[in-house]
Amino acid sequence: MKYGIGYLLGLGALALQPLAHGADLQLKSSLTANRVIPADYYWNQFGCSGANLAPRLDWQNAPAGTKSFAITFYDQDAPTGSGFWHRVVYDIPANVHSLPGGKDGGPLPEGAIESNTDLGKPGFFGPCPPEGRQHRYKWTVHALNVAKLPVKPDYSAALTGFFLWQHTLAKSELVLLAGPRKESTQ
């Protein structure tokens, strides 16, 4: 026998490892994953006329060692070659497990920091896909191993994302669809 009992037991332990750690981090929303976002959630610029609403977000099953959370909202299909960041929030305290959503993103918990988006300023802006195209928009919750992310609010979304990935223990994603918007007749 080429492999010994110890080797096989080790493989069995690896297979059961996820069970020993409990359930994975889960992100849920008031909107349904992989479904089209209602138009009233759209931004109110660039040809869109929505109310700029964010959905409620809830997360659970953070891994041991989680010291804070971050939430991002990203258009992975934006015609930029690198997507488009619609919201970046970090330093969400570890005892917070939801954001209520609402107009302009809704309120944030005390201590949370809203970083620059790809508009070059902090805040939230809802989806606004180009006319005639459907885009995939991704909400992500990151469980972080630091209470305070070592970034400044004026960092670009991409640079903040770089630091997020360095400190992410686990993440959960929720993809929503927006569009296609009808072409204007003007």
Name each model feature, range by range.
Residues M1-L8:
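Bacterial N-terminal signal peptides that target proteins for export
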Residues H21-Q186:
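N-terminus-centered regions that define maturation/targeting leaders and the start
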